């Protein structure tokens, strides 16, 4: 196998830009990526990130999706006690098609900054495969880093698209079907799978949403770009205490994260929605359409 040619240095492990502001809470806002999707449903969500019960960050995400296209954007910032020792903010966005019963991303962009250090990523995809990439800053080469081969960059999702679950068909979205999947993520530096398994269904209530949530257990499975000898990689690979709670986005077949819980070495990291404002958007009918 050969390493895929890139427009930037070979992807490597994520730097400390506050973990690009803690994953996808730390995301979004680049909406000028090619024109709006034809939206049948829209979600405006706000989240808070805590570790061991201590607030570290807040963020917001907007999703618009129709039958054939979707776009996701969001932003986040460091808050709480962490602001006394660190600063950080980030924006990210993704857009793509809905085809073959799944999300097929086309573009992804991330801009993050922490303590004066910037991190950027730009991915362009076609038919689920990576075509172009720019990532800054590059990391120093490491002999034990698993190389990223072209074969593992097929049928991938960017981190924003991978944070949402698409349930095809017309059946009940609030069922075990929401968890019956493995999510293949590539963030420009690492390729990994998130294997979901159904656990249970809970009742939740937050501003804008009151109803059921499907709870999935999650296993982190590194594929490429990681360093197997690193303790954090070993810890996360063996971590059996990761879960995501999913709720439906009105007017779509998308499921959004209500809560993400990850056991860490310093306490449980909890990303939880403080509001989930979801609405169905009626299609516009031309004035000359048949009546």
Q: What feature does the model see in each segment?
A:
Residues 1-16:
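N-terminal secretory signal peptides that target proteins for export/translocation
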Residues 16-26:
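Sec-dependent N-terminal signal peptides
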Residues 25-28, 263:
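Local alpha-helix boundary/kink/capping signal
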Residues 39-127, 173-291:
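Acidic, serine/threonine-rich low-complexity disordered tracts
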Residues 112-160:
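Internal, conserved structured core segments that host functional sites
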Residues 151-188:
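Extracytoplasmic beta-rich ectodomain segments of secreted or membrane-anchored proteins
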